[in-house]
Amino acid sequence: MTRTKYQQLQPEERMRIEIWKAEDVSLRAMARRLGRAPSTLMRELRRNATARGGYGAMSAQACRTQRLKASRPVAKLAPDGVLWGVVRHFLDQKWSPQEISATLKRAFPDQPDLNVSHETIYNAIYAYPRGELRRQLIACLRQARTKRLPRSRGTDRRGQIPDMVSIHVRPPEVNDRLMPGHWEGDLIKGAGNQSAVGVLVERMSRAVLLVKMPDATAASALAGFTGKLQSLVAPLRQTLTYDQGREMARHAELSAATGVRVYFCDPHSPWQRGTCENTNGLLRQYLPKGTDLSVYSQEELDAIADSLNGRPRKTLNWHSPLQVLAQVLANPTDRLPVQ
Protein backbone atom coordinates (compact mmCIF):
# COMPACT_ATOMS: atom_id res chain seq x y z
CA MET A 1 0.00 0.00 0.00
CA THR A 2 1.39 3.38 -1.04
CA ARG A 3 1.65 5.86 1.80
CA THR A 4 0.18 9.28 1.08
CA LYS A 5 2.59 12.14 1.66
CA TYR A 6 1.46 14.35 4.54
CA GLN A 7 0.59 17.95 3.63
CA GLN A 8 0.49 20.82 6.08
CA LEU A 9 -2.78 22.62 6.67
CA GLN A 10 -3.26 25.55 4.34
CA PRO A 11 -4.38 29.08 5.43
CA GLU A 12 -7.85 28.63 3.91
CA GLU A 13 -8.31 25.39 5.87
CA ARG A 14 -7.41 27.21 9.07
CA MET A 15 -10.03 29.85 8.26
CA ARG A 16 -12.68 27.13 7.95
CA ILE A 17 -11.58 25.53 11.22
CA GLU A 18 -11.96 28.89 12.98
CA ILE A 19 -15.51 29.29 11.63
CA TRP A 20 -16.59 25.73 12.39
CA LYS A 21 -15.11 25.85 15.90
CA ALA A 22 -17.14 28.98 16.60
CA GLU A 23 -20.22 27.02 15.42
CA ASP A 24 -19.33 24.12 17.78
CA VAL A 25 -18.83 21.68 14.89
CA SER A 26 -17.26 18.48 16.25
CA LEU A 27 -13.64 17.68 15.57
CA ARG A 28 -14.52 14.54 13.58
CA ALA A 29 -17.03 16.45 11.47
CA MET A 30 -14.45 19.13 10.67
CA ALA A 31 -11.91 16.46 9.73
CA ARG A 32 -14.45 14.76 7.45
CA ARG A 33 -15.33 18.03 5.69
CA LEU A 34 -11.64 18.83 5.08
CA GLY A 35 -10.69 15.28 4.13
CA ARG A 36 -8.17 15.22 6.96
CA ALA A 37 -7.45 12.79 9.74
CA PRO A 38 -8.98 13.73 13.13
CA SER A 39 -5.50 13.50 14.65
CA THR A 40 -4.32 16.28 12.31
CA LEU A 41 -6.98 18.66 13.56
CA MET A 42 -6.41 17.63 17.17
CA ARG A 43 -2.71 18.46 16.82
CA GLU A 44 -3.53 21.78 15.11
CA LEU A 45 -5.92 22.87 17.86
CA ARG A 46 -3.50 21.85 20.60
CA ARG A 47 -0.46 23.56 19.05
CA ASN A 48 -2.09 26.81 18.03
CA ALA A 49 -4.67 27.44 20.74
CA THR A 50 -4.94 31.02 21.97
CA ALA A 51 -4.25 31.99 25.59
CA ARG A 52 -7.94 31.61 26.38
CA GLY A 53 -8.24 28.24 24.71
CA GLY A 54 -9.79 29.54 21.51
CA TYR A 55 -8.53 29.28 17.94
CA GLY A 56 -7.75 31.99 15.37
CA ALA A 57 -6.68 31.24 11.80
CA MET A 58 -4.32 34.20 11.49
CA SER A 59 -2.55 33.58 14.80
CA ALA A 60 -2.30 29.84 13.98
CA GLN A 61 -0.69 30.62 10.61
CA ALA A 62 1.72 33.03 12.30
CA CYS A 63 2.72 30.35 14.83
CA ARG A 64 3.29 27.90 11.99
CA THR A 65 5.52 30.38 10.13
CA GLN A 66 7.54 31.12 13.26
CA ARG A 67 8.13 27.43 13.98
CA LEU A 68 9.25 26.90 10.39
CA LYS A 69 11.80 29.71 10.61
CA ALA A 70 13.12 28.43 13.92
CA SER A 71 13.59 24.92 12.52
CA ARG A 72 15.73 26.04 9.62
CA PRO A 73 19.50 25.82 10.17
CA VAL A 74 21.53 29.01 10.00
CA ALA A 75 22.99 29.45 6.53
CA LYS A 76 26.61 28.36 6.44
CA LEU A 77 27.53 31.41 4.39
CA ALA A 78 25.47 33.97 6.28
CA PRO A 79 26.49 37.49 5.14
CA ASP A 80 27.58 38.42 8.67
CA GLY A 81 29.42 35.15 9.32
CA VAL A 82 33.18 34.59 9.63
CA LEU A 83 33.26 32.00 6.83
CA TRP A 84 31.61 34.35 4.34
CA GLY A 85 34.22 36.98 5.22
CA VAL A 86 36.98 34.53 4.30
CA VAL A 87 35.22 33.49 1.09
CA ARG A 88 34.61 37.11 0.10
CA HIS A 89 38.29 37.91 0.63
CA PHE A 90 39.34 35.20 -1.83
CA LEU A 91 36.62 36.17 -4.31
CA ASP A 92 38.03 39.68 -4.30
CA GLN A 93 41.40 38.12 -5.18
CA LYS A 94 39.73 36.55 -8.27
CA TRP A 95 39.84 33.02 -6.86
CA SER A 96 37.20 30.66 -8.20
CA PRO A 97 34.73 28.92 -5.84
CA GLN A 98 36.51 25.61 -6.49
CA GLU A 99 39.88 27.10 -5.59
CA ILE A 100 38.45 28.58 -2.39
CA SER A 101 36.71 25.36 -1.38
CA ALA A 102 39.80 23.21 -1.93
CA THR A 103 42.06 25.63 -0.06
CA LEU A 104 39.77 25.77 2.99
CA LYS A 105 39.52 21.98 3.04
CA ARG A 106 43.28 21.66 2.99
CA ALA A 107 43.85 24.40 5.58
CA PHE A 108 41.14 23.24 8.02
CA PRO A 109 40.68 19.47 7.49
CA ASP A 110 39.26 18.90 10.98
CA GLN A 111 37.02 21.98 11.16
CA PRO A 112 33.85 21.38 9.12
CA ASP A 113 32.52 24.80 10.12
CA LEU A 114 35.31 26.35 8.05
CA ASN A 115 34.75 24.08 5.04
CA VAL A 116 32.28 24.87 2.28
CA SER A 117 31.59 23.33 -1.13
CA HIS A 118 31.99 25.35 -4.31
CA GLU A 119 28.29 24.78 -5.08
CA THR A 120 27.39 26.49 -1.81
CA ILE A 121 29.58 29.47 -2.71
CA TYR A 122 27.93 29.80 -6.11
CA ASN A 123 24.49 29.55 -4.51
CA ALA A 124 25.36 32.22 -1.95
CA ILE A 125 26.50 34.61 -4.67
CA TYR A 126 23.47 34.17 -6.89
CA ALA A 127 21.08 34.26 -3.93
CA TYR A 128 21.84 37.95 -3.43
CA PRO A 129 19.03 40.24 -4.63
CA ARG A 130 19.62 42.28 -7.74
CA GLY A 131 21.84 45.23 -7.03
CA GLU A 132 25.38 46.54 -7.01
CA LEU A 133 26.68 44.02 -4.45
CA ARG A 134 25.37 41.10 -6.51
CA ARG A 135 26.99 42.52 -9.64
CA GLN A 136 30.29 42.92 -7.80
CA LEU A 137 30.22 39.32 -6.58
CA ILE A 138 29.35 37.89 -9.99
CA ALA A 139 32.10 40.01 -11.54
CA CYS A 140 34.56 38.12 -9.31
CA LEU A 141 33.70 34.88 -11.08
CA ARG A 142 35.46 33.63 -14.15
CA GLN A 143 33.29 34.12 -17.23
CA ALA A 144 33.02 30.78 -19.06
CA ARG A 145 31.44 30.02 -22.42
CA THR A 146 29.54 26.78 -23.03
CA LYS A 147 31.47 26.39 -26.27
CA ARG A 148 34.98 27.57 -27.03
CA LEU A 149 35.41 29.28 -30.39
CA PRO A 150 38.64 29.10 -32.40
CA ARG A 151 40.99 32.01 -31.84
CA SER A 152 41.11 32.80 -35.53
CA ARG A 153 38.69 31.92 -38.27
CA GLY A 154 40.42 33.91 -40.97
CA THR A 155 42.53 32.73 -43.86
CA ASP A 156 45.13 30.01 -43.48
CA ARG A 157 48.36 31.76 -42.53
CA ARG A 158 50.73 28.86 -43.25
CA GLY A 159 53.71 29.94 -45.26
CA GLN A 160 53.75 33.49 -43.89
CA ILE A 161 56.30 32.57 -41.20
CA PRO A 162 59.67 31.42 -42.53
CA ASP A 163 61.40 28.29 -41.27
CA MET A 164 58.59 27.10 -39.01
CA VAL A 165 59.20 23.90 -37.04
CA SER A 166 56.02 21.86 -36.51
CA ILE A 167 54.68 20.85 -33.12
CA HIS A 168 54.67 17.28 -34.44
CA VAL A 169 58.48 17.10 -34.16
CA ARG A 170 58.53 18.63 -30.69
CA PRO A 171 60.40 16.43 -28.16
CA PRO A 172 58.06 13.93 -26.44
CA GLU A 173 59.12 15.05 -22.96
CA VAL A 174 57.26 18.31 -23.58
CA ASN A 175 53.98 16.39 -23.71
CA ASP A 176 54.80 14.52 -20.50
CA ARG A 177 54.99 17.72 -18.39
CA LEU A 178 57.62 16.05 -16.22
CA MET A 179 60.31 18.70 -16.59
CA PRO A 180 60.01 22.49 -16.31
CA GLY A 181 61.12 24.98 -18.92
CA HIS A 182 58.62 24.20 -21.68
CA TRP A 183 56.34 27.14 -22.45
CA GLU A 184 53.26 28.00 -24.43
CA GLY A 185 52.84 31.53 -25.72
CA ASP A 186 50.18 33.85 -27.05
CA LEU A 187 49.30 37.49 -27.56
CA ILE A 188 46.09 38.99 -26.18
CA LYS A 189 44.97 42.19 -27.84
CA GLY A 190 43.16 45.15 -26.35
CA ALA A 191 40.51 47.54 -27.61
CA GLY A 192 40.60 47.95 -31.37
CA ASN A 193 43.69 45.72 -31.56
CA GLN A 194 45.72 48.83 -30.66
CA SER A 195 47.42 47.36 -27.58
CA ALA A 196 48.75 43.95 -26.60
CA VAL A 197 50.06 41.81 -23.76
CA GLY A 198 52.31 38.82 -24.32
CA VAL A 199 51.48 35.65 -22.39
CA LEU A 200 53.90 32.86 -21.49
CA VAL A 201 52.70 29.79 -19.56
CA GLU A 202 55.01 27.09 -18.25
CA ARG A 203 53.46 23.72 -19.09
CA MET A 204 54.44 21.71 -16.02
CA SER A 205 53.71 24.25 -13.26
CA ARG A 206 51.17 26.46 -15.15
CA ALA A 207 53.18 29.49 -14.03
CA VAL A 208 52.37 32.56 -16.12
CA LEU A 209 54.49 35.51 -17.22
CA LEU A 210 53.01 38.66 -18.77
CA VAL A 211 54.82 41.06 -21.08
CA LYS A 212 53.75 44.62 -21.87
CA MET A 213 53.96 45.37 -25.61
CA PRO A 214 53.25 48.59 -27.50
CA ASP A 215 51.59 46.68 -30.34
CA ALA A 216 51.23 43.23 -31.91
CA THR A 217 54.08 43.49 -34.40
CA ALA A 218 56.85 40.93 -34.80
CA ALA A 219 59.39 43.49 -33.58
CA SER A 220 57.48 44.09 -30.34
CA ALA A 221 56.95 40.36 -29.76
CA LEU A 222 60.65 39.68 -30.32
CA ALA A 223 61.75 42.38 -27.88
CA GLY A 224 59.13 41.58 -25.24
CA PHE A 225 59.42 37.79 -25.21
CA THR A 226 63.22 37.88 -25.48
CA GLY A 227 63.54 40.16 -22.47
CA LYS A 228 61.19 38.09 -20.34
CA LEU A 229 62.76 34.73 -21.26
CA GLN A 230 66.29 36.04 -20.68
CA SER A 231 65.27 36.92 -17.11
CA LEU A 232 64.80 33.20 -16.37
CA VAL A 233 67.46 30.76 -15.25
CA ALA A 234 68.79 28.53 -18.04
CA PRO A 235 66.93 25.33 -16.98
CA LEU A 236 63.63 27.18 -17.49
CA ARG A 237 64.47 28.10 -21.10
CA GLN A 238 63.83 24.98 -23.18
CA THR A 239 60.97 25.24 -25.69
CA LEU A 240 58.13 27.57 -26.69
CA THR A 241 54.97 26.39 -28.45
CA TYR A 242 53.10 29.09 -30.37
CA ASP A 243 50.33 29.42 -32.92
CA GLN A 244 51.00 30.70 -36.43
CA GLY A 245 50.47 34.33 -35.51
CA ARG A 246 52.55 36.69 -37.60
CA GLU A 247 53.97 38.31 -34.47
CA MET A 248 56.23 35.25 -34.17
CA ALA A 249 57.77 35.77 -37.62
CA ARG A 250 61.17 36.54 -36.03
CA HIS A 251 61.26 33.32 -34.01
CA ALA A 252 64.75 32.46 -35.25
CA GLU A 253 66.13 35.61 -33.63
CA LEU A 254 64.27 34.77 -30.43
CA SER A 255 65.86 31.32 -30.33
CA ALA A 256 69.33 32.73 -31.01
CA ALA A 257 69.00 35.24 -28.17
CA THR A 258 67.47 32.94 -25.54
CA GLY A 259 68.29 29.35 -26.51
CA VAL A 260 64.56 28.55 -26.55
CA ARG A 261 63.45 26.34 -29.45
CA VAL A 262 60.14 27.46 -30.98
CA TYR A 263 57.52 25.00 -32.29
CA PHE A 264 54.38 25.99 -34.18
CA CYS A 265 50.88 24.56 -33.84
CA ASP A 266 48.71 23.52 -36.77
CA PRO A 267 46.39 26.26 -38.10
CA HIS A 268 43.15 26.73 -36.15
CA SER A 269 44.19 24.22 -33.44
CA PRO A 270 44.00 26.05 -30.09
CA TRP A 271 43.81 22.74 -28.21
CA GLN A 272 47.48 22.18 -29.09
CA ARG A 273 48.18 25.06 -26.68
CA GLY A 274 45.46 24.13 -24.20
CA THR A 275 47.37 25.37 -21.16
CA CYS A 276 47.72 28.85 -22.64
CA GLU A 277 44.10 28.90 -23.82
CA ASN A 278 42.90 28.08 -20.31
CA THR A 279 45.18 30.73 -18.82
CA ASN A 280 43.81 33.32 -21.25
CA GLY A 281 40.37 32.58 -19.82
CA LEU A 282 41.65 33.24 -16.31
CA LEU A 283 43.36 36.43 -17.46
CA ARG A 284 40.08 37.86 -18.73
CA GLN A 285 39.06 38.25 -15.08
CA TYR A 286 41.85 40.81 -14.76
CA LEU A 287 42.00 42.10 -18.34
CA PRO A 288 38.44 42.01 -19.73
CA LYS A 289 37.90 41.96 -23.48
CA GLY A 290 37.76 45.43 -24.96
CA THR A 291 40.14 46.87 -22.36
CA ASP A 292 42.82 49.32 -23.43
CA LEU A 293 45.83 47.24 -22.42
CA SER A 294 48.25 50.13 -22.96
CA VAL A 295 47.20 51.66 -19.62
CA TYR A 296 48.78 48.75 -17.70
CA SER A 297 52.41 49.13 -16.67
CA GLN A 298 54.78 46.17 -16.58
CA GLU A 299 54.65 46.34 -12.77
CA GLU A 300 50.86 46.02 -12.85
CA LEU A 301 51.07 43.07 -15.24
CA ASP A 302 53.63 41.42 -12.95
CA ALA A 303 51.20 41.85 -10.04
CA ILE A 304 48.44 40.15 -12.06
CA ALA A 305 50.81 37.29 -12.89
CA ASP A 306 51.76 36.97 -9.21
CA SER A 307 48.08 36.79 -8.29
CA LEU A 308 47.45 34.02 -10.82
CA ASN A 309 50.56 32.11 -9.81
CA GLY A 310 49.47 32.16 -6.17
CA ARG A 311 46.06 30.64 -6.87
CA PRO A 312 45.59 26.90 -6.25
CA ARG A 313 44.78 24.89 -9.38
CA LYS A 314 42.68 21.77 -9.60
CA THR A 315 45.00 20.30 -12.22
CA LEU A 316 47.90 20.74 -9.74
CA ASN A 317 46.05 18.87 -6.99
CA TRP A 318 45.18 22.26 -5.50
CA HIS A 319 48.77 23.44 -5.24
CA SER A 320 49.65 26.79 -6.75
CA PRO A 321 52.00 27.20 -9.75
CA LEU A 322 54.51 28.93 -7.47
CA GLN A 323 54.50 26.00 -5.04
CA VAL A 324 55.04 23.48 -7.83
CA LEU A 325 57.79 25.46 -9.52
CA ALA A 326 59.62 26.20 -6.26
CA GLN A 327 59.49 22.55 -5.24
CA VAL A 328 60.84 21.33 -8.57
CA LEU A 329 63.64 23.88 -8.72
CA ALA A 330 64.68 23.07 -5.14
CA ASN A 331 64.41 19.28 -5.50
CA PRO A 332 64.18 18.16 -9.14
CA THR A 333 63.47 14.54 -8.17
CA ASP A 334 60.89 15.34 -5.46
CA ARG A 335 57.83 16.77 -7.18
CA LEU A 336 54.42 17.66 -5.81
CA PRO A 337 51.68 15.36 -7.12
CA VAL A 338 49.73 16.81 -10.04
CA GLN A 339 46.92 15.50 -12.19
UniProtKB/Swiss-Prot annotation:
Molecular functions per Gene Ontology: DNA binding; transposase activity
Domain Integrase catalytic: 176-329
A GO cellular component annotation in the UniProt record: cytosol
Extent of the signal sequence: none
GO biological process: DNA integration; DNA transposition
SUPFAM superfamilies: Ribonuclease H-like
NCBIfam families documented for this protein: transpos_IS30
Summary of the function given for this chain in its UniProt record: Required for the transposition of the insertion element.
Name recorded for this polypeptide: Transposase for insertion sequence element IS1086
Species of provenance: Cupriavidus metallidurans (strain ATCC 43123 / DSM 2839 / NBRC 102507 / CH34) (Ralstonia metallidurans)
